[in-house]
Amino acid sequence: MRAIIKFKWAIAAIVLALTVVLSLFSPNLTELANQKGQAQLPADAVSERANAILKQAGEDNNSISVVFTLDNAIKKETENQLRIIIDKIKKIDGVEEVTSPLSAEKEVKDQLMSKDKKTVLMPVTITGSDKKAEKIADEIYQIVPDDLTAYITGASLINQDFAHSSEEGLKKTEVITVCLIIGLLLIVFRSVVTPFIPIVVVGFSYLISQSILGILVYNVDFPISTFTQTFLVAILFGIGTDYCILLLTRFREELANGHDKKEAALIAYRTGGKTLFISGFAVLIGFSALGFAKFAIFQSAVGVAVGVGILMIILYTLLPLFMVTLGEKLFWPSKKVLSHSDNKLWAFLGRHSVARPFLFIVITVVITLPFILTYDDQISFDSTAEISSDYKSIKALEAIKDGFGEGKAFPINVVVKGDKDLTTADTIPYLGNISKAIEKVDHVDSVMTITQPTGKKIKDLYIDNQLGSVSDGLDKTVKGIADVQSGLTDIENGLNQMAGQTGSASNGGSGGSLGDAADGLGKINQQLQLVSKQISQTGNTAQTVQQLTAISGQLGQIQTGLEQANQQLSGQQAQAGTLTESLKKLSEGVKSANEGLTKVSDGITASSDILEDMSKSPTVRDTGIFIPDQVMKDKDFKKSIDQYSFADGKGVQLSVVLDSNPYSEQAITTINQIKKAVANEVDGTPLENAQIVYGGVTSMNADLKELSTTDFSRTMVIMIIGLFIVLTILFRSMIMPIYMIASLLLTYYTSISITELIFVNGLGNAGVSWAVPFFSFVILIALGVDYSIFLLDRFKEEVHLGIEQGVVRSMSKMGSVIITAAIILAGTFAAMMPSGVNTLMQVASVIIIGLLLYGLVILPLFIPAIIATFGEGNWWPFGRKKGKE
């Protein structure tokens, strides 16, 4: 410290130069937080795997939705305006495709226009980052004429609005924090100079910290979140001010004791500096332990550890400069010696706590337990609730919700990826089965894929419809045969009549052959009657075709015979002309009947072929779907395949629309049920070895829930173990760390319970924001441990008076220090309340409630009672070094 004081100006110049250079040349941390600060899931998360598959296939284009809200049902004039808008949007750089709500296809139109025709949806496929999406949205807003109301939304735009909201909240927090600290320090020190010293010291720490973090984030992908800067401000200014108060108070006391300013500074750092180092080191360890978290947004809290490390360096280098330069002027105009007087309230509570420890432990439990028992752990993953409804992306969501339902904006994307083509007639039917399985899950509104591109199944693909068509065809066959029979009966009668005429005229020459032909037709009619009956009773198409082919041959012979008879007649009697003409017509009738039978036979053959193909298809029994070759070649069906497949058919997608808010807890429950339903459905099918993953907002939130829950528990254990080791070494005890940490856990769970009551039960929020439990736990434990260190470190000094007296004296001396520090730290977090960001307000609430609860209840009631209960056991297993405390 003497060397630091000796070279104080050189050190100050280095700190100033370093701050200026870093501020000028380091990357902007705010911009980096906007770019990289979103909740980034690990690569093995289901939603990230879905994104990776689509990205590899070039199918990872972004999508935004333009929503038009009309006062009345859409008119021709508005449709013309929309066509012009669509043409202009297509010309914007970065726009890949615009799906027109004015499509000629009714199914598409129904999907993009509400039933009352007052809400029109226009999906726009784009490329680029979230920032690029925001730029495209701004250009679209400029295109929309003033007489139309349009809002634009999408995951990228919501992310950007959240980033802007957080940025605005940070600016408010910075200003309010500085004002609060100045106000509180004016009250504490009664000086117009002193309040600005912590502001300057912590200000340098903050500027250097955010510059170093910017360099780390930019160059080595150091974890960052949109909350990093806000927490950095609150924590650095909070504990930095506390530490400054600790050192400045001791410095002034030493000045009053007659020491010169240099010696007073040395003593202040030799005594108060020890406590500062221990407390700062504990906070540093607490936040550094978060580097073991798997989730990047949780790891981002390590940035606070960087800030705390810088703060410690600045406190030991820059603050001494002000002490030895200004001396007593640092406290101008106050002349009174500043020292915390004994806290009578804490002394009173301490005496009674050690006298009746069990009673005060019970009182602590009575105060905290009711709140803990009400805790439901209601967590919200709705990022749209984080920002004001004034943002256009949120207004667009509300418009979609009102016009189409909540799930329309962000459907679940089921991605199926295999090693072989999945768009064959043998595999597509299994997609139909998956669709049916998903549709049976509660809260699923519709499923769109190859077999049902608009959410409604293509009926002609299902064998019940196809068999119905075959049945209808066989009915028509029977009717066709009946028509042929009727025609042949007429021909038979005509031939018999002609046979009589020609027989009397020519002594039976031609008459005999005509009679034979008539007899032949009679027999054919009888055969047709049997065929018709057989089709009706058995549906045996193969045998029917053989019989009809034979009958057709017989009709051909009769036709040939009639043509020969016609030639014979033409050379005979005078009336032969009339008979010849009649015979010609009858011959043509036979020909027509034969052609009719051929058509009937062809129809039966087609039906027979379909039935044969069905019998050979392995999918019919499993799925009830059969896709004939002509359907696979159909233009519209090919379009459906192209729309829902990728990677040359090796990948397919299903789009699942829910009837609930895609950000809600209900949606997460639904997607988990969908996963189970799909897994059961593909078991034992050609798709069982395919990768099946899930993308979209709901899938991301499901991953977020699983990861945040497991990683929170894991990180909590790591942090507690780290603190336990540090505190064990510090206090040479394994008992003290246990009840110190237990008291902090009790404080945390009580505080989070009260916060849940306020925001969920009181303000009607869906739940506490998902990041709140983690960040509030980390901050409250890391900062709260400071105050227990303040108290127990003083207890080590006073324990020579006896355990009970040592506790009472420690509480008397440290009560005002701890309460003042807690109020200042709570004040810096209170500065987060006007931010308007739900997560920040809820974290601030937990910290404020926790600090006040810890300072007013847990430390003065619980800790002394526990110390008195353990007695000499407080130093187990190492034992107390008597006379050296």
UniProtKB/Swiss-Prot annotation:
It is a multi-pass membrane protein. Residues 498-518 are annotated as: Disordered. It is found in: Cell membrane. Keywords: Cell membrane, Membrane, Transmembrane, Transmembrane helix. The chain crosses the membrane at residues 9-29, 181-201, 202-222, 227-247, 278-298, 304-324, 354-374, 716-736, 740-760, 772-792, 817-837, 847-867. Its main location: membrane. One of its GO terms (cellular component) is plasma membrane. It comes from the Bacteria. InterPro entries: MMPL_dom, Mycobact_MmpL, SSD. PROSITE patterns: SSD. Belongs to the resistance-nodulation-cell division (RND) (TC 2.A.6) family. MmpL subfamily. This is Putative membrane protein YdgH. It comes from Bacillus subtilis (strain 168).
